[in-house]
From Swiss-Prot:
Gene3D superfamilies: Aminopeptidase i, Domain 2 (2.30.250.10), Zn peptidases (3.40.630.10). One of its GO terms (biological process) is proteolysis. The lineage of its organism: Bacteria, Pseudomonadati, Pseudomonadota, Gammaproteobacteria, Pseudomonadales. This is Probable M18 family aminopeptidase 2. One of its GO terms (molecular function) is metallopeptidase activity. It is an enzyme of class 3 (hydrolase). It comes from Pseudomonas putida (strain W619). Coiled coil: none annotated. The gene is apeB. Pfam families: Peptidase_M18 (PF02127).
């Protein structure tokens, strides 16, 4: 099971260079398992025991396994994650031709570690909107090949590089795509038109706009003397998306189960398809009776907010509270913050710990040092919007928000096992 899950995760990461591709990858796997797509613009005719999914903005997705009994009886088991990761996004008018090189201007998306983006083989993917035969259409593209690089400045010209280097995103991050001769001008949108023709065999009249991200072309991989680790891009938080999907499909539960994977978590979640938007609430309102029954159902439900945790790094152990240093390959982490940066409380933490103990899955705890600030997740946002009880958990990770992150190769199986048990649980606290 562990080997198959790890291989599946690596394949999923490769197929999901952007939130758009991640959502499409999740939808493809759901459809293969018998889930039917619901269009938000149509009326829905759902039945008990039915399996459905809905997307918004092509970058967020909710999968619903409607229980055979009414949700009011047993409540709803929800797992939440996010599809986006810090990256470099292409600007609307990006062409830069300097010193005989074609470069693209980029904007930093989210709280990225910037130094690892240098000297990497980069490709480009995302969504392109274009006009064809008088109609406006959108399509996903992925160049796949390494088409760009951000070369470092040689240490001979930057003698203090190893003493602390503050990167200027405006000046230092535009990737190089090509060498150009003389006054030759390159039209980036024409390049996108060519890519649409290559990848989808369609002839766009004009590219109107796009949402494109650079990404590292190096595939995720098992590494270490004993293959103890998985190294790869976007583990935060596609690792949790994939774990939630595998648990949902494995559970085959008679209870009502939901998997929600939102976009825009890394930039605050405040969007139509983010956790701070109405997507989940509107979806549940369409599936559940109104008024009193809706509120009662939510109050009988529980959400597991799954987002990676900070594993204790052997070179930087002092960055953790001495009693709360999550270890890689030692199981999922219950995340606690008394200032509500995480939504965990004693009841939800206790129930998750109970599930782990019943499934013989190791479990850990994390609280940030008292002299450091704490990050957050979709957990508190979803809890405050829905009023649903929530526990924040995640798998320990190194190098979070780097271009290449690291997790334990045993932990995915741990998380899938306990999330499957959660979806199958007959009673919620």
């Amino acid at each position: 099971m562990r080997e198959a899950l790890n291989t599946g995760l690596i394949d999923f990461l490769k197929a999901s260079p952007t939130p758009f591709h991640a959502t499409a990858s999740l939808a493809l796997r759901l459809e293969a398992a018998g889930y039917q797509r619901l269009d938000e613009r149509d009326s829905w005719a759902t039945v008990p025991g039915g399996r459905y999914y809905v997307t918004r903005n092509d970058s967020s997705i909710i999968a619903i396994n409607l229980g055979k009994q009414a949700p009011l009886q047993g409540g709803i088991r929800m797992v939440g994650a996010h599809t986006d990761s810090p990256c470099l996004r292409v600007k609307p008018q990006p062409e830069l031709q300097r010193q005989g090189f074609l470069q693209l201007g980029v904007e930093v998306y989210g709280g990225a570690l910037l130094a690892p983006w240098f000297d990497r083989d980069l490709s480009l993917a995302g969504r392109v909107t274009f006009r064809r035969d008088g109609k406006v259409e959108s399509q996903l593209i992925d160049f796949k090949l390494p088409i760009a690089i951000i070369p470092n400045l040689a240490i001979h010209l930057n003698r203090t590089a190893n003493e602390g280097w503050q990167i200027n995103p405006q000046n230092e991050l535009p990737p190089i795509l090509a060498q150009v001769a003389g006054d030759e001008r390159i039209d980036f949108r024409a390049l996108l038109t060519e890519q649409l023709a290559r990848e989808h065999q369609l002839n766009a009249d004009v590219v109107l706009d796009y949402e494109l991200s650079f990404y590292d072309t190096q595939d995720a991989a098992l590494i270490g003397l004993n293959s103890d680790f998985i190294a790869g891009a976007r583990l935060d938080n596609l690792l949790s998306c994939y774990a939630g999907l595998q648990a949902l499909l494995a559970a085959d539960s008679d209870e009502t189960c939901v998997l929600v994977c939102n976009d825009h978590e890394e930039v605050g979640s405040c969007s139509a398809c983010g956790a701070d938007g109405p997507m989940l609430e509107q979806t549940l309102q369409r599936l559940l009776p109104d008024g009193d029954t809706y509120v009662r159902t939510i109050q009988r439900s529980l959400m597991v907010s799954a987002d990676n945790a900070h594993g204790v790094h052997p070179n930087y152990a002092d960055k953790h509270d001495g009693n709360h240093g999550p270890k890689l390959n030692a199981g999922p982490v219950i995340k606690v913050n008394n200032n509500q940066r995480y939504a965990t409380n004693s009841e939800t933490a206790g129930f998750f710990r109970h599930l782990c103990m019943a499934e013989e899955v190791p479990v850990q705890s994390f609280v940030v040092r008292s002299d450091m600030g704490c990050g957050s997740t979709i957990g508190p946002i979803t809890a405050s919007h829905l009023g649903v009880r929530t526990v924040d958990i995640g798998l320990p990770t190194f190098a979070m928000h780097s271009i290449r992150e690291l997790c334990g190769s045993h932990d995915l199986a741990h998380l899938v096992k306990v999330l499957t048990a959660f979806y199958r649980s007959r009673e919620l606290p």
